Design a protein with these regions (language model features):
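Bacterial N-terminal signal peptides that target proteins for export
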Residues: 1-8
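Residue-level hotspots at or immediately adjacent to binding/recognition sites across diverse folds
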Residues: 22-292
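C-terminal segment of classical bacterial N-terminal signal peptides
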Residues: 14-21
């Protein structure tokens, strides 16, 4: 199995970033209508990826994770790696192929691809913890492995040939994860610096750009579409969590109206539909879909 490694130098990115806090929610660029999606009979559902047909990858169960693919109005197609103890389905492409990770009966995390109903384990050679977090239409998956010291290392796995592309970020002293890849080869993710601070990033057209939502204490990018619109979460100075969209050099804050201050956006498709989850006042985790 081939391994390719390259090093990206950090580039100081100059952008004029506009931060907007919106609840019900619109600005001059976006207007979303939110729908809550919960797995029947469960109080914990996360929606993590969405393709252009509106099929959604996710999982339910706080204690024991079980994966699914969801289509409206209420069709949950259960998807779990065979004989696994737990499964999270995270990325989905326009063919309906998915990726994610599963935990085996020994408690080990493995990445996986589900290509037309055929499951394949994806583990970086010599490692014991892998997760795949995003998948494009070329069957390239974004993910990471953890080394023996517990430090995460981001990579891209190309299913066509089984090639791993390792991404080395000099500032990522505390580790990094690749969370999404689009058909143009742009990559989203986040890294942890020497002070333990989380920063989002996007690699587009060979340029590495750090993403820090203005005034935040933590920023993590979780996905992107073919327009290089990036989504994720940030934590504000009060410790509240909000979703964001980064587009054309500008940030916009996004909260599901039912989960203001507890919202995470994990996926976005080319129709600018977003998926994620929020936590209710009662402690339940609800999935959501936002459409313009």
């Amino acid at each position: 199995m081939k391994k390719i490694e390259f090093t990206l130098a950090l580039v100081a990115a100059i952008c004029f970033c506009r931060a907007t806090s919106i609840s019900a929610w619109e600005d001059d660029r976006f207007r979303f209508h939110f729908r809550t999606v919960n797995f029947p009979g469960d109080t914990f559902t996360q929606l993590l990826g969405i393709n252009d047909s509106g099929t959604i990858a996710g999982y339910h169960g706080a204690a024991v994770n079980k994966g699914f693919a969801f289509t409206f109005p209420n069709d949950f197609d259960l998807e779990n790696f065979p004989n696994s103890a737990q499964t999270q389905v995270i990325g989905i492409n326009n063919r309906g192929y998915t990726d994610g990770f599963y935990i085996d009966n020994a408690g080990t995390n493995h990445g996986f691809l589900d290509i037309n109903g055929t499951f394949t384990t994806v583990d970086f050679p010599g490692t014991t913890l892998n997760q795949l977090l995003g998948l494009n239409n070329l069957e390239q998956a974004a993910g990471y492995y953890a080394d023996a010291a517990g430090i995460d290392h981001p990579y891209i796995f190309d299913h066509n040939g089984g090639v791993f592309l390792v991404i080395t970020i000099p500032a990522a002293v505390g580790g990094a994860q690749a969370t999404g890849i689009n058909d143009n080869g742009s990559i989203s993710g986040f890294y942890i610096d020497s002070k333990g601070t989380n920063h989002g990033f996007v690699i587009a057209k060979g340029r590495f750009q750090t993403l820090d939502f203005p005034g935040s204490t933590l920023t993590q990018a979780f996905g992107l579409n073919n327009h290089d619109e990036v989504v994720g979460q940030y934590v504000d100075a009060s410790g509240l969590t909000h979703g964001f969209i980064f587009d054309d050099g500008r940030f916009t804050s996004v909260d599901d109206p039912e989960g203001v201050g507890t919202t995470t956006i994990n996926g976005i498709n080319d129709r600018r539909q977003i998926v994620g989850f929020f936590v209710t006042a009662g402690g339940n985790t609800n999935g959501f879909v936002g459409s313009e």
